[in-house]
């Protein structure tokens, strides 16, 4: 079995009213030799602000924070919520180059105790090695 790095940081947000406590430099220390790096960071704005430009070694970031604004439309091939004007990555899976982010819209609420069009979400990921050797990362 391969080893993976599960990296977690405290909140880091690009909007000034949210604190920037997450320290990726410390959290990724001693992970260079691990072939797969997964990051848990609450605020999806962390992805564009630091992960994409400065931490290319992080394969996937898992995030939340947006709640999908508790209002919007999600269909098989379409999703919209006013929150996308603040957070470009606000619900579901996004990719840029070899990196990915998954933003979970959460189960709870903020303010109004309900949701319209954005259902509560619990996500389960199953990690498996690829059978295709060209997709397997080299350490």
Go through each PLM region and give its residues:
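Soluble catalytic domains of enzymes that build or remodel membrane lipids, polysaccharides, and related
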Residues: 1-139
